[in-house]
Structure formats: structure tokens, C-alpha cells
């Protein structure tokens, strides 16, 4: 449309113009046809490849279906075998339980007969020996309870120290965040902002410092959780007394604070699980053995002078973990103490 209104100075110029234009369109047409041929060839190759892949996938699907059917049959056979073995095992267990009941009955009869014979021969000597053994066992249990209470008191002291360390770390983290914000505001017109990696680390450190749980904390040892905050604070004091810290150094300090707070949180959760375990164990403690021993002592056997002081000492040092103060230690307590030590 635009070429129709164009004027030429001579017919030769017009002829050359239209010839060049025709060559240009011809070249474009040839290029377009070449691209079309290449596209058709590529599409045919791609179609052939897709058909080959489809055949492979169909073959694999058939193989998987056959494998699935085989596995289903094997599962059914295994279920049948398991049911047969289960029924056979149940029958054997029933037979063994009957044998055990008969054996226990015979054992009870024999023990009763033996007790009657021994009671006729040495009743007084046996009573004295049983009383002495019960007193020794009671004193041993009192000593174990006192040791356990002392251990729990030391754990409470360490918990208080860790709470102070956590509060101090929170204050230091808040001060570091405020100083970092002020430093960034001051350095913003002069220096470029830190990269995305440093900003991400800063956000992670701030989130870590703000996500400390509020449950009571536990402590692995006297040197792992108490020395680290003090050393970290001394490092901060020495760094702030000299030249001001760079943003990268402050970010690394925040990362250290976040790691320490996460460790303290893990210790808190462990102590909470230990306390829950102790709460679960406390309702099962009964006063049967101790009351029986007390009856024997009142029936005519003199009590030892040291047993009264040990009992008073144990009742004075007993911690209130959801248990009455007058309840003695039971045989289940040593196992609970072992579980607590294992968790710690």
C-alpha cells in the first residue's frame, strides 16, 4: 500500500526497486519453506520418539501389572501361613499357660509345707533375721532416696543458672538487634546494603532468639551450658570496647546467640520430658513395704538410732514433684532414676 504511492525518477529505478523487492520476498519465502521443512522433520522425529517411549511405557506397565499380581498372590499365601502359625502359637501358649498354672500350684503347696516345717523349728530366729534384713533394706532405700533428692536439687540449681543465662542471652540478643538496626541506619547512605544471604541469616538469627520455649530447662553438665554464655559475653565486651563491629560480625554474633538459644531450648524439652516421666511414675508408688516394716518395728524389735535421723533427713530433703511428703520410696524409683539419667 505504501509502495503504490511512491514516485520514481525513472523507469529503470522503478524496475530495480520492484526487482529487489521481489527478490526479498522470494528469499523470505524460501527461508520460510526451509524452516517449515525443518519443523516437519523435527516434528516427525519427535513423534517417532514419543511413540517409542509410549511403547516402552506400555511394556513397563504390563510388566508392573504382572509383578503386582504376583506379589498379591504371594501376599495371600503369606497371610494364610501367618494365620496358621498364629493359631498354632496360640494353642501352644494356652498349653504352656495351663502347665504354668499347675506348676505354680505345686510350688505353692511345697512352699507352704516348707514354711510350716521351718516355723515349727526356728520361728524366733527367722523373725529376728527377717526384721534385721527388712531394716537394712529400708535404710538402703532411704539412702537411695536421699541421694536421688540431692541429685534433683543439684539439677534445680543448674536449671536456675540456665534460666539466668537464657535471660542474659535474650537481653544481649535484643541489644545486638538494636545496635544492628542503628548501625544499618547510619551506614545506609554510605555503604551498600548486605547481600541477600546476610539478610537471610539475620532473619534466621532474630527468629531463633525470639522462639525460646518457656519450660524449665535441663542441663547436661556444669561445663557445657554455663561457661559458653560467659565466654560469649566477655567476647562481646572486648569487641565493643575497641573498634565498632561490622555488620557481618554482628550477624555472626546473632547467629551464635541463636544457636545457643536453640541448644537451651532442646535442654528445656528434655528436662520437661523427664519431669513428665517422674509425674507418670509417682502415682504407682505405694507405702506397702514401708508400712509392713514399721509394724514389725512396733511389734517388739528395737529400732536403730541411725534410722530415725536418716528418715528425718530424707523427709527434709524430699522435693515436691506431685508426691506427698510422707510417702516413702518404692522399688520402682531406682528404675525411674536410671531412665532420667539416660535421658539426661
Swiss-Prot record:
UniProt-listed Pfam families: NUDE_C
Key words, A-Z: Cell cycle, Cell division, Centromere, Chromosome, Coiled coil, Cytoplasm, Cytoplasmic vesicle, Cytoskeleton, Developmental protein, Differentiation, Kinetochore, Lipoprotein, Membrane, Microtubule, Mitosis, Neurogenesis, Palmitate, Phosphoprotein
Region of interest: Self-association: 1-93
GO CC terms: centrosome; cleavage furrow; cytoplasmic vesicle membrane; kinetochore; microtubule; microtubule organizing center; spindle; spindle pole centrosome
PANTHER family: NUCLEAR DISTRIBUTION PROTEIN NUDE HOMOLOG 1
Subunit structure: Homodimer. Interacts with dynactin and PCM1. Interacts with CENPF, LIS1, CNTRL, dynein, tubulin gamma, PAFAH1B1, PCNT, SLMAP and TCP1. Interacts with ZNF365. Interacts with RAB9A; the interaction leads to RAB9A-dynein motor tethering. Interacts (via C-terminus) with MCRS1 (via C-terminus); phosphorylation of NDE1 inhibits the interaction.
Official protein name in the record: Nuclear distribution protein nudE homolog 1
Amino acid at each position: 500500500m505504501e509502495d503504490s504511492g511512491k514516485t520514481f525518477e525513472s523507469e529503470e529505478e522503478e524496475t530495480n526497486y520492484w526487482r529487489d523487492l521481489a527478490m526479498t520476498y522470494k528469499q523470505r519465502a524460501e527461508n520460510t519453506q526451509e524452516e517449515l521443512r525443518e519443523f516437519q522433520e523435527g516434528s516427525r522425529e519427535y513423534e517417532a520418539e514419543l511413540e517409542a517411549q509410549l511403547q516402552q511405557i506400555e511394556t513397563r506397565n504390563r510388566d508392573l501389572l504382572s509383578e503386582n499380581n504376583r506379589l498379591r498372590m504371594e501376599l495371600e499365601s503369606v497371610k494364610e501361613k501367618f494365620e496358621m502359625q498364629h493359631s498354632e502359637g496360640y494353642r501352644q501358649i494356652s498349653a504352656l499357660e495351663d502347665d504354668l498354672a499347675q506348676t505354680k500350684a505345686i510350688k505353692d503347696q511345697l512352699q507352704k509345707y516348707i514354711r510350716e516345717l521351718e516355723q515349727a523349728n526356728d520361728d524366733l530366729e527367722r523373725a529376728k533375721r527377717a526384721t534385721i534384713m527388712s531394716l537394712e533394706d529400708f535404710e538402703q532405700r532411704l539412702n537411695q532416696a536421699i541421694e536421688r533428692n540431692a541429685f534433683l536439687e543439684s539439677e534445680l540449681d543448674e536449671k536456675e543458672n540456665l534460666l539466668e543465662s537464657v535471660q542474659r542471652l535474650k537481653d544481649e540478643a535484643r541489644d545486638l538487634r538494636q545496635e544492628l538496626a542503628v548501625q544499618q541506619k547510619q551506614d545506609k547512605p554510605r555503604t551498600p546494603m548486605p547481600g541477600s544471604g546476610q539478610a537471610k541469616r539475620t532473619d534466621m538469627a532474630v527468629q531463633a532468639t525470639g522462639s525460646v520455649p518457656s519450660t524449665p530447662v535441663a542441663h547436661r553438665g556444669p561445663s557445657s551450658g554455663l561457661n559458653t554464655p560467659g565466654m560469649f559475653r566477655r567476647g562481646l565486651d572486648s569487641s565493643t570496647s575497641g573498634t565498632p563491629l561490622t555488620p557481618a560480625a554482628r550477624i555472626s554474633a546473632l547467629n551464635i546467640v541463636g544457636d545457643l538459644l536453640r541448644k537451651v531450648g532442646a535442654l528445656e524439652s528434655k528436662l520437661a520430658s523427664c519431669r513428665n516421666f517422674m509425674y507418670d511414675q509417682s502415682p504407682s508408688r505405694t507405702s506397702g513395704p514401708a508400712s509392713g516394716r514399721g509394724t514389725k518395728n512396733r511389734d517388739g524389735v528395737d529400732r536403730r538410732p541411725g534410722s530415725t535421723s536418716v528418715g528425718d533427713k530424707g523427709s527434709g530433703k524430699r522435693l515436691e514433684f506431685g508426691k506427698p511428703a510422707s510417702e516413702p520410696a518404692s522399688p520402682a524409683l531406682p528404675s525411674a532414676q536410671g531412665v532420667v539419667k539416660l535421658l539426661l
